[in-house]
């Protein structure tokens, strides 16, 4: 890989489990692995960073702070600096709402939080995207959910007063 051109840091960016099923490279173009999961501060709906898996095999994971993100291109994220090295067991302790079940007013599962639109400079989550089925399937609808509509958060699930997903706008 050659030199990657530096781009203006975007103000907003869509993040799939944050930018981050994408390929991660440093500014010199070196491959640093595939994005793995986002970590956040759920009570404030703020993205703090994400992790990458440098290799398909092995337990090692790298954790990146949001302020290390330099640019986002199609299926690629450019970072600056060194990641913190960790393992899967430690990553499991980092908080995230992504992939949590969304429970409605009747405590029934309406879908999952599968993505977020984030203001990259501050990490503020502007809204979550909810999918009823597997978000990797082509044609899967996504609904926009404002963080203010969440009533409660527990491990692996968030609760809202929604009756159904059709109460939300489609993304």
Give the positions of each predicted feature.
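Peripheral interaction segments used for macromolecular assembly
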Residues: 1-171
């Amino acid at each position: 890989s050659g030199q990657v051109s530096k781009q203006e840091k975007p103000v907003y960016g869509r993040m799939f489990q944050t930018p981050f099923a994408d390929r991660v490279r440093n500014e010199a173009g070196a491959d640093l692995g595939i994005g793995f999961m986002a970590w956040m501060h759920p009570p404030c709906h703020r993205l703090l960073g994400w992790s990458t898996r440098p290799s398909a095999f092995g337990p090692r994971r790298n954790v990146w702070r949001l302020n290390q993100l330099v640019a986002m291109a199609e299926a690629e994220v450019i970072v600056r600096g060194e990641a913190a090295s960790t393992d899967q067991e430690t990553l499991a302790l980092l908080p995230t709402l992504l992939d949590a079940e969304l429970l409605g007013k009747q405590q029934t599962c309406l879908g999952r939080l599968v993505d977020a639109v984030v203001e990259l400079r501050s990490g503020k989550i502007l809204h979550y995207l909810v999918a009823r089925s597997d978000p990797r399937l082509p044609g899967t609808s996504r609904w926009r959910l404002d963080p203010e509509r969440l009533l409660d958060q527990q491990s692996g699930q968030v609760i809202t007063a929604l009756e159904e997903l059709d109460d939300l706008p489609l993304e």
